[in-house]
């Protein structure tokens, strides 16, 4: 059986070298850590190579799987990381858990507006800009703006001048008359800056920096320089979030090799709180598949209709509107279009990864059977059939066969057998009977023969099977045996006239394949034996009671559901199910004596 380490190793090979977030999962598929990276592949690989500190070592020790989301920038990755941490509360993200909401910069709606940092958005109370990745970024931006623009600072208008007036960071509207046009001009410049319309402001700031430098006011020049640098660092386009509170779902899709991946971003309070990726085989045109999908997406009450649904611009808006009863938007530019493009890109990445993993899995399984054939000295075993017996002290003996083609389970070829000619717990004779029955029928029907037969057992099992094949059926098919250790795990494969151990590394793909085959045939046999045991156990109790035929047996099962519940029932309960008094008493007695 392939280990989780092998699965992670394979998955790492298809992670793109792009910015994004990753989610680490434990053995219970619970998200235990969320992180971000400028280059996802490099960061994820670093977790599984080299030495780490104690905390990271503990984290890596619990990782059994991971997911990732591609973004368009590092800033975007950070904001998404915070969203995911708020949503999933991973226990390894201690430092980020306390951040309850994103910070915004707000220009208040007052006669003399103020510039404040807030985490609460109240409609109609002012203009909001953000969200910012963290409080430090927002506070630093406000601090620089305060130094450049003498906005009012006090919450309530005082009756005297404050310190900010004396250091040149406030015009003092509490005492002196202030030109409202000048104040409005400052407000517009700040608004432009916070909206990212920075070309004019950058030009003005660079000019002011030059003037300050020429007048030897280097401190003021440094402040202008810092503000210019801050604009470059913090005023990046952030596609993963929006500053408005509109509830919207954003759809994107990609197609490849007859498959379609539809990606949905759920935007709430301006933040992407969740995404959904669905893979569907293309049965119609891509547009028709999309219309069908989006109609079912909301019609089946799986998702609540948002205020807006954003979709790619080339789709038929009217057709979508006919199946989705909310506002349909097809953004043509700006952040909203960027978000649709990002959904398309994530759908494309999801498809690429899926096909790469499938291709690698195909290559790995084909390589596994080729190597298995080489190490055993036989032709590549394209078709493998494996047998296992199951019984308890010879009671209800059964056998099962599983079929693997090209290293993958062929469940249509699975077979179940009840042992008919063997009395008592005789594994060897049971195996002979089943192999005889299986390949006699195969020969009669002209069905394809396997390239390799595997039995769960050692030399004795192999000898019996070979004898039946060669001396009774005239077949020459390689037969191998699989032995388990004291922990009931596959330990070695036996092959050849002397049933010798075939040298094979335990971490090789052929060995993993043999483990999968042995585990699967054992599971199949055990399940069949359990079903048989339950059925015969039911018959052995109910069939011994006079007055209970097929109809009453069926009615009892429908009423009580199981023998266990019948045992818990009183005579009166049994009678109420439709049995005569004497039959109910006899059944109650039989059930009480059946352990």
From Swiss-Prot:
Residues 199-234 form the UVR domain. Signal peptide: none annotated. It comes from the Bacteria. GO terms for biological process: nucleotide-excision repair; SOS response. One of its GO terms (cellular component) is cytoplasm. The keyword DNA damage applies. Keywords: Cytoplasm, DNA damage, DNA excision, DNA repair, Excision nuclease, SOS response. Its main location: cytoplasm. Residues 17-94 form the GIY-YIG domain. It is found in: Cytoplasm. PROSITE patterns: GIY_YIG, UVR, UVRC. One of its GO terms (molecular function) is excinuclease ABC activity. Belongs to the UvrC family. Interacts with UvrB in an incision complex. The UvrABC repair system catalyzes the recognition and processing of DNA lesions. UvrC both incises the 5' and 3' sides of the lesion. The N-terminal half is responsible for the 3' incision and the C-terminal half is responsible for the 5' incision. This is UvrABC system protein C. It comes from Staphylococcus saprophyticus subsp. saprophyticus (strain ATCC 15305 / DSM 20229 / NCIMB 8711 / NCTC 7292 / S-41).
């Amino acid at each position: 059986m392939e280990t989780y380490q092998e699965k992670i190793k394979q998955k790492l090979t298809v992670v793109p070298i792009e910015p994004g977030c990753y989610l680490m999962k434990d053995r219970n598929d619970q998200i235990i850590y969320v992180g971000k990276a400028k280059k996802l592949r490099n960061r994820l690989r670093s977790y599984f190579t080299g030495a780490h500190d104690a905390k990271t070592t503990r984290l890596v020790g619990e990782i059994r799987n991971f997911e990732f989301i591609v973004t368009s920038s590092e800033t975007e990755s950070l904001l998404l990381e915070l969203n995911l941490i708020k949503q999933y509360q991973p226990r390894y993200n201690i430092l980020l858990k306390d951040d309850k909401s994103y910070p915004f910069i707000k220009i208040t709606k007052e006669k003399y507006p103020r510039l404040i940092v807030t985490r609460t958005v109240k409609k109609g109370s002012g203009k909001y800009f953000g969200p910012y990745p963290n409080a430090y970024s927002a506070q630093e931006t406000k601090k620089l703006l305060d130094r450049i623009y003498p906005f009012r600072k006090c919450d309530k208008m005082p009756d005297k001048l404050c310190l900010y007036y004396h250091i040149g960071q406030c015009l003092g509207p509490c005492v002196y008359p202030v030109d409202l046009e000048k104040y409005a001009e400052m407000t517009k410049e700040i608004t432009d800056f916070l909206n990212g319309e920075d070309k004019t402001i950058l030009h003005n700031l660079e000019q002011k920096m030059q003037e300050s430098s020429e007048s030897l006011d280097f401190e003021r020049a440094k402040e202008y320089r810092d503000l210019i640098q801050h604009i470059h660092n913090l005023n990046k386009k952030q596609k993963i979030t929006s500053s408005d509170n509109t509830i919207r779902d954003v759809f994107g899709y990609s197609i490849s090799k007859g498959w379609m991946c539809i990606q949905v971003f759920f935007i709430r309070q301006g933040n992407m709180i969740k995404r959904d990726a669905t893979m569907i085989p293309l049965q119609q045109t891509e547009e028709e598949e999309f219309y069908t999908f989006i109609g079912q997406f909301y019609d089946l009450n799986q998702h609540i209709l948002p205020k807006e649904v954003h979709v790619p611009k080339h789709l038929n808006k009217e057709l979508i509107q006919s199946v989705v009863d909310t506002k349909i938007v097809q953004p043509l530019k700006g952040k909203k279009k960027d978000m649709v493009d990002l959904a398309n890109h994530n759908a494309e990445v999801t498809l690429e990864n899926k096909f790469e993993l499938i291709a690698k899995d195909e290559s790995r399984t084909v390589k596994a059977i080729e190597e298995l054939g080489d190490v055993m000295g036989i032709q590549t075993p394209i078709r493998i059939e494996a047998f296992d017996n199951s019984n308890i002290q010879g009671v209800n003996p059964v056998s099962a066969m599983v079929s693997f083609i090209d290293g993958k389970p062929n469940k249509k070829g699975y077979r179940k057998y009840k042992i008919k000619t063997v009395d008592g717990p005789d594994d060897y004779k049971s195996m002979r009977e089943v192999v005889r029955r299986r390949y006699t029928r195969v020969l009669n029907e002209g069905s394809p023969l396997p390239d390799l037969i595997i039995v769960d057992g050692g030399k004795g099992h192999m000898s019996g099977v070979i004898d039946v094949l060669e001396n009774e059926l005239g077949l020459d098919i390689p037969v191998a045996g699989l032995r388990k250790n004291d922990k009931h795990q596959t330990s070695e494969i036996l092959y050849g006239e002397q049933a010798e151990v075939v040298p094979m590394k335990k971490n090789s793909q052929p060995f993993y394949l043999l483990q999968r085959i042995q585990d699967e045939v054992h599971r199949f046999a055990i399940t069949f034996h359990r079903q048989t045991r339950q059925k015969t156990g039911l018959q052995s109790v109910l069939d011994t009671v006079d007055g209970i035929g097929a109809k009453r047996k069926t009615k009892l099962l429908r009423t009580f559901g199981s023998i266990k519940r019948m045992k818990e029932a009183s005579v009166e309960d049994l009678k109420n199910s439709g049995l005569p008094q004497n039959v109910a008493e006899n059944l109650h007695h039989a059930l009480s004596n059946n352990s």
